[in-house]
Design a protein with these regions (language model features):
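Proline/glycine-enriched tight loop/beta-turn segments at coil->beta junctions
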Residues: 1-9, 122-124
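Gly/Ser-rich "nucleophile elbow"/oxyanion-hole loop immediately N-terminal to the catalytic nucleophile
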Residues: 1-5, 51-88, 101-103
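Active-site machinery of serine-nucleophile hydrolases
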Residues: 7-9, 13-64
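Active-site nucleophile loop of the alpha/beta-hydrolase fold
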Residues: 50, 108-116
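Short beta-strand immediately N-terminal to the catalytic nucleophile in serine-hydrolase-like folds
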Residues: 83-85, 110, 130
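Short glycine-enriched nucleophile-adjacent loop
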Residues: 90-101, 107
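C-terminal catalytic histidine-bearing segment of alpha/beta-hydrolase fold enzymes
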Residues: 126-130, 134-194
Length: 194
């Protein structure tokens, strides 16, 4: 019944506590946890594991190569590739998206941050950022600076602040079906063939 169908893809970047070589760690939070609870999750979910001694923003070329290979090998719709991550993965989301904005139909960084001077690279990419205002690990100003910089250059950005919430802004975000509906509302234009 799904022959010939091309699926939307979500690339999920985990937090620092899930680095290493044990894939079971990656399943503790975020998209992998949602997929385990929802067998009919309507996306191809890609959840790589960051090596122990590095951070996602240092893995940007590797992540790009991974995405390229997945799009080439599998039935993925290249106009519906979405990116999200929490904490270290939120930083990685900003870094990967600002480096390769043409890849993504929409992104959702959670309790992360980036380089505000690079934010305008995302002015054509819908962004929905999330952060708890009581986060003791990654201060909310990290997200605020990126959101403000993106707004200044006319970007399509939403910002959800969870009042009284600490570092775990991701459980509430990933358990909310509205996020996935929002992702699916966004699609990149088809690339014209030359």
């Amino acid at each position: 019944e799904n022959a010939g169908r091309h699926w939307p893809l979500i690339l999920y970047l985990h937090g620092i506590g899930e680095r290493g070589e044990t894939l079971a760690q990656v399943k503790r939070h975020g998209i992998p946890k949602v997929v385990a609870q929802q067998p009919d999750f309507p996306f191809v979910a890609v959840s790589p594991q960051c090596p122990e001694e590095t951070l996602w923003h240092q893995q940007v070329p590797t992540l790009k190569a991974l995405l390229d290979e997945i799009v080439e090998r599998y039935a993925v719709d290249p106009t519906r590739i979405y990116l999200t991550g929490n904490s270290m993965g939120g930083f990685g989301t900003w870094a990967l998206a600002t480096a390769y904005p043409e890849l993504f139909a929409a992104i959702a960084p959670i309790c992360g941050g980036g380089e505000p001077e690079q934010a305008c690279a995302l002015k054509e990419v819908p962004v929905w950022a999330f952060h708890g205002d009581a986060d003791p690990v990654v201060d909310i100003t990290w997200s605020r600076k990126m959101v403000e910089a993106l707004r200044e250059c006319g970007g399509d950005v939403r910002f959800t602040v969870y009042e009284g919430v600490g570092h775990d802004a991701w459980t509430r975000t990933y358990e909310n079906p509205t996020l996935y509906t929002w992702f699916l509302q966004h699609k990149k234009p088809d690339n014209p063939r030359s």
